[in-house]
């Protein structure tokens, strides 16, 4: 397994939107590639989102996990738990025959019921209308679990499901797992615990 791509976003850097259609961004190390980690030092009690992709024999996986140095403020912990709950909602609906846009709509509706409609998958004009994407020979490929997608989910599809919530000026929380769609429950291809890791 090789690391293909990834970024580490800590504190307020995690709330900086991307120039790409993605819920995560970051300042980056240079204006030549304004994405990902910055030179800012990681501080205690702030969210540290590690979003990384692996590659093995030409196939990719995608995963995000949340860390902190010491405890996080309670509202960020609740936001992270909301992302885990949204991931579970997506997995409940990720079945052969489901319409990709309906899977997204149910995830967005749950985010709204939990109080995160304006921060789910980023904020303002940077807010994206998807909660997952296909992954395989490319890191981002069809199907997209996105608003407006008429694509029908089929067994054998591999997707990265990535609910994220942005806290402006403070950071980003969330999870991401790569799963295989089966005729039953989706099979996790990423297996590390999804809970916040306090260092």
Regions found by a protein language model. Give the residues of each.
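Active-site neighborhoods and metal-handling regions in enzymes and metal-associated proteins
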Residues: 1-199
